[in-house]
Amino acid sequence: MPVMAPAMAPIILAPEIIHNIIYFLIHDYIVLLDDDSWGLVPGYGRYAAISRIWQNEIERETFASLRLDLDRLLQANFIVTHRRRRLVRTIKLDVALPMPGPVESPETDEEKLRNNRRLQVTFEAFMRFMCPWQPYDVRHGGVKLYVDTSIPDDAFTWRPITPQSRKRRAKLERRRASSLVELTNPSRISEYPPILAITEYKGNSSDLNIHISAVATCVLLAKLPAAKVAFIDWWRCNHFSRIRSDLAAAISQIKYPIDHLSISDSSLTYGDWFPFSPPPASSIQEVDELSISIRNMSQRLKRLDIYDISISDELFFPKTPSIDMMPIWDGLVMISLHYLPITHSGEWLFLPDPDASSSSEEEPDSDDSSSWDGWPSEESQPKPSIAAPAMQQFYLAAAHAALQMPALKQMKLIALLENGICWHKFWYYSEEMMARALWTSSSGFVPDEEVLDRWRMVPRKHIEIDLEVEISEDENALESLDDENDI
């Protein structure tokens, strides 16, 4: 009688191993020209038929990141069922704009209106889709929201680079740099119920896209009361200074507390010099409403970052404070301000060095730019480098504010000057048994005694120790202290 071989026991893998096998099987670099194109491969859904375990893993990866445009939003409720909401970690909202006009010409009024209408209907469709979601519907930590625009011509960016495509891309970038997508009816967004499942917001992640107005961003943010991290991009704030008043009003509508708020102009890279011009007379306000709105909102923050936008000392303290209405920042721990050398009203915070050579002596940049692209030319514009008297008042206002910030651990105030040539930086840092203040500049700036006395009061009030003061001309002094304190 033949002896039967014993049946082999099935191989049972740990769930973590199965997860990793499935993950790397269904993910790859989709576009070889782009290192950031890691994603789900075409046809990955067929693996769901292997077993129930595989089906659950495939579904989890499918709904972890939703890419929604207007067409998909209209069908999303039928696909993203109530049970699947818990699988969603990120939503990438794509405002798919109509085909643009010729890249050789500026955006027309008709084209701008079409784009604005598309933003309006996309935001409204998103509100209708997300408003029913509750915090208990989604995973712990909520859902991150990323918002960008796209146009049908975006596909060309994945093609092999040729001299012709490079020239076309340069023209397209300049055309997009002069465009801004705005809501046609912001009040309609305000009428929707709040979205409670979104805990983080970020938009305008690519310089190649047509950018969404910071006002539209804030209108949407005002409907996201669970958001703890938010990034507001005021694209080319100097060029689009006309929206400053509307942006101030939109920020004032954000009533809830946020852990971390960042407001920046993504068209600039910190440290790069850019020729700034005074704002047009039509956009100048006697009262800096934007700085006041940010100041009011910052009293509900833990961390505030501002990069490359024009502000005034109203950001820190009202010019005519009332004893009964003194601002107080109970929870603010960190503030980082990288500010332009010119205020909203056209006042220069830094003056040109009379001994420095004029920028007109430099070789002009021949980038084939056209007259309509909105980028100012440097020509013979002097570059500011020496702190104006207004900077003493600026630091005094900052000290007044710091006295009202009992939780403050760090404040950085850094001027956007010519990288590697000029610098002007301030840094305040405190911990349980130590408090430091550093001023470092290329022009030999020294704070006056009133400023120093006011800053010495800050740690005495909050942690009852004396302030260590350092005045330097070392460009890297601030970074060295950062490393020393491991910030």
Task: Give residue ranges: language-model regions.
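Leucine-rich solenoid repeat modules
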Residues: 128-133, 312, 317-487
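Long, low-complexity intrinsically disordered regions enriched in Ser/Thr, Asp/Glu, Pro/Gly
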Residues: 2-3, 7-18, 23-30, 81, ...
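Hydrophobic regular-secondary-structure patch
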Residues: 2-110, 114, 144-160, 166-172, ...
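Leucine-rich repeat
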Residues: 59-63, 84-88, 105-299, 303, 309-321, ...
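The substrate-binding groove and active-site-proximal loops of carbohydrate-active enzymes
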Residues: 64, 111-117, 380-389
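Generic preference for well-ordered alpha-helical elements
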Residues: 14-19, 37-51, 116-123, 213-217, ...
